[in-house]
Amino acid sequence: MSISSKIRPTPRKPSRMATDHSFKMKNFYADPFAISSISLAIVSWVIAIGGSISSASTNESFPRFTWWGIVYQFLIICSLMLFYCFDLVDHYRIFITTSIAVAFVYNTNSATNLVYADGPKKAAASAGVILLSIINLVWILYYGGDNASPTNRWIDSFSIKGIRPSPLENSLHRARRRGNRNTTPYQNNVYNDAIRDSGYATQFDGYPQQQPSHTNYVSSTALAGFENTQPNTSEAVNLHLNTLQQRINSASNAKETNDNSNNQTNTNIGNTFDTDFSNGNTETTMGDTLGLYSDIGDDNFIYKAKALYPYDADDDDAYEISFEQNEILQVSDIEGRWWKARRANGETGIIPSNYVQLIDGPEEMHR
């Protein structure tokens, strides 16, 4: 086996779950805020359109721009219902907020013209546009805020589907993890020691030059949170490593043939070079030292957690796994912001702790 394959194992690419955005009325019915606010908006719109029609049918003067404001409000209500049915509210939050802000300006302007105008039939129209203005203001507060804001979390707590995931928190966690990974470079001293002992001490600048206190050392900071500690190597570097491996093996064989008295010493050099890369286990590699791809028994996953909302793994991080909302996961470590977990299909990796909730305490190790 070549050195490069031991240093940089090929990780499994996490599968990304396809989000279902088909038309479902239950997406709308499952959100009490959507049902209540849109229902009130429809009632207010009917009052406004009824009062406007009755007022315009008489000799009373009626502001013509109000008609466009009423039609525009109807389009906003229909769009909101479609966004909820297709579960696309989070994808169009900016569009929804700006559109409702325009409707708020239209309705407040119409309310000013109708309240101070003469005619009893304009009272119903003014009441309708005032109610629409209030509802629009509430919508701006909700859709303009992030899902992690206190108001949105309180409102979403009444929803059957639970609290919506926050794109802001998700991006901050991923940026923090990338920063931690980039500030903890790893250098395998066994590679340098084997080259030096074999007589081919060549300066190699492929990795950051730092000297840990002993061989086969991995920074504890890099292991915190199961960070990815494997170095970045190119194809040219891998070719260079394979060439050095052949030269080392040739030198070791020559020493064994010419000097039988040092046979034990040469054997130790070769064995140390092969086994230290796998941390004493020839069936694992550097990536598997983290325990993410090895076969682990059920007894090690002593916690159970329930997913509060779905999560899509990052393509740039091979250790993350995706999961669906309300999915039950087995967890083996609950310290830090990222937990090691396993899905029901056997997929193992790390998950963000703020996306799940523990539902069971530690199980007995021997049952």
From Swiss-Prot:
Main location: membrane
Cellular compartments annotated: Cell membrane; Bud; Bud neck; Cell projection
Domain SH3: 300-361
InterPro entries linked to this entry: SH3-like_dom_sf, SH3_domain, Sho1_SH3
TM regions (residue ranges): 33-53, 66-86, 94-114, 123-143
Pfam family, one: SH3_1
SMART domains in alphabetical order: SH3
Membrane topology: Multi-pass membrane protein
Region feature (Disordered): 252-276
Compositional bias per record (Low complexity), positions renumbered to this chain: 259-272
Glycosylation sites: 59
GO biological process entries: regulation of actin filament polymerization
Residue spans, topological domain Extracellular: 54-65, 115-122
SUPFAM superfamilies: SH3-domain
Origin superkingdom: Eukaryota
Residue spans, topological domain Cytoplasmic: 1-32, 87-93, 144-367
Subunit organization: Forms homooligomers. Interacts (via the SH3 domain) with PBS2. Interacts with FUS1, STE11, STE50 and RNA polymerase II.
Family, similarity comment: Belongs to the SHO1 family.
The protein's name: High osmolarity signaling protein SHO1
Organism annotation: Saccharomyces cerevisiae (strain RM11-1a)
Designated gene of the protein: SHO1
